[in-house]
Amino acid sequence: VKIGCCVSLFHDAVFTLSELGVDYAEIGLSELSLHSGEEISERAERLSEAGVPCLAGNVLFPGELALTGPHTELSAISEYLGATLEKAALLGVRTVVFGSGGSRRAPEGFPREAAWEQLRGLCAELLSPALQKHGMTCCIEPLNRRECNILNTSEECACLVREVGKPNIRLLVDLYHFDLEREPLSVLAGYGDILAHAHIASAKNGRALPKEGDGEDYAAFFQALRSIGYSGSLSLEGSVSGTFEDCIAESAAYVRNFSALKA
């Protein structure tokens, strides 16, 4: 399993990840719209010089871009998506994460079934072809019900992935959201064919990054991943205590111990 770290492309700490024992950066995608291709290419060059691959990106859509409800604008969504993936390609991004709770949230009173169909259509008809152009994969991320009102569990997201039926639309499992939704680890057994990315943080400790003695059973999570043959990417996505460098280095080393264990 490759261990990554979620950090802004425009936070200079991103250039230190290799030194901290991290395999790749996972950057925020929605902020790319605020920067020119030239700026992004310059950051990409510096990442290359620092030996930090930028393999993943999250927050695919900004909160103000509605993906569900009566006021969605497919032309605006398509235009944003095309421009954002073009910029992500400059960085070498291979996996994009579709969490984006603000944009996918169904408006109050809007039928859930209609919102589901909008998201299914978005993934199948807009997102999948746009990804194919760049050889990217999108992983749908379950978000706990405090953050969004649709696609809250891995089971729901897996159902959507299978309904879409596209090889570049896959599933992400985030241990933080997984635990808040009280999903049993046993459900992971059914995702061996669609799981393509993972996030990790502690639900018991306010989304803090994993560290020894924090009360979480990370061994069971990694055992469940190993049992389905998962050997992909897993990103640290949580709050930092102390200095960024010390916290990331400690957490990456701790998590890597679990990922290296044999089944």
Where does each model-flagged region fall?
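Histidine-acidic metal/acid-base catalytic patches
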Residues: K2, F10-G21, I77-S78, E86-R94, ...
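Active-site beta-loop-alpha junctions enriched in small/polar residues
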Residues: C6-F10, G28-L32, V59-P62, G101-S103, ...
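Basic, amphipathic N-terminal segments that precede the first structured/catalytic domain
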Residues: V14-L34
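Glycine-rich, proline-tolerant flexible connector loops at the mouths of alpha/beta enzymes
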Residues: I27-L47, S100-P107
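Short, function-defining helix-loop hinge/capping sites that tune catalysis or transport
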Residues: L34, E64-A66, N149, R182, ...
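Active-site acidic/histidine proton-transfer and metal-coordination neighborhood
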Residues: E49, L67-R170
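Short, structured active-site "lid" loops
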Residues: G51-C54
